[in-house]
């Protein structure tokens, strides 16, 4: 059984992206797109995986608004085609992500939250929540597939 391989979770995410974010190959489809003040049907070429990564981090920003509706007054998206970057930000509080060492895991809390798969504050099913992120993948998938994540 020399052909049996064991991958780390991150290696698996990178080797089998379709399991986590969908197909990476570009597809072409027609969509209604806002063009100025009206919608027009346009043919778009895009990567479903890239769209999913964008969606995952956008949902994280929106979840901050769900948890702190009066504190979050702005969610911004900036796309820089020349730099090849997408920036999503909100002005909400970090919501309990303290910059200190996590006692049990031995890593900094922000690293645990944004860099370790399957970590989440939304695993307590006894609490009613209206959030998109529940499984501990969202921001981490964006981080894994990004060349820069801050």
What are these regions (language model features)?
Residues 1-150:
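GHKL (Bergerat-fold) ATPase N-terminal catalytic module, capturing the glycine-rich phosphate-binding loop
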